[in-house]
Amino acid sequence: MVEKKYHALLDDRIFFGGAADAEEAVTNEKIDVVVDLRVKEPEKVTYYRVHAPIADEAKQVEASILEAVDKVVSAYRDGKKVFFHCGGGGGRAGTVAVGTLIELGQATSVEEAEQKAKAIRNKVNVREPMKIALQNIYDK
């Protein structure tokens, strides 16, 4: 059996990984919507994808994280299977994994959610500006 390069975040309905894993996840998991977190304009694909880039600019990071997490959580709550990705599946995808776990009640703090996300996918690496933004949003 071939090992998957992407991971299930929750209930075998929310998956995450890198951009190169999207097509495989769509095929294998019957994904309904792919959320692309990369800043650059995405290439053409054959599956349904929404572009929800997480900004690098400090003043836009929180809003872009909230928008991306909302797209994932809304699709999940609508009964859809979701795959979200950034380039490599660690930074932006890890950030959205943290927010998604908190929004869906699977963690109560950024630290707890980050540890859970890392336990699922060891590539998760939430960079400092994004961690601060997550803490501003969720650790109140």
What are the residue ranges of the model-derived segments?
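Cysteine-based protein phosphatase catalytic domain of the PTP/DSP
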Residues: 2-81, 102-133
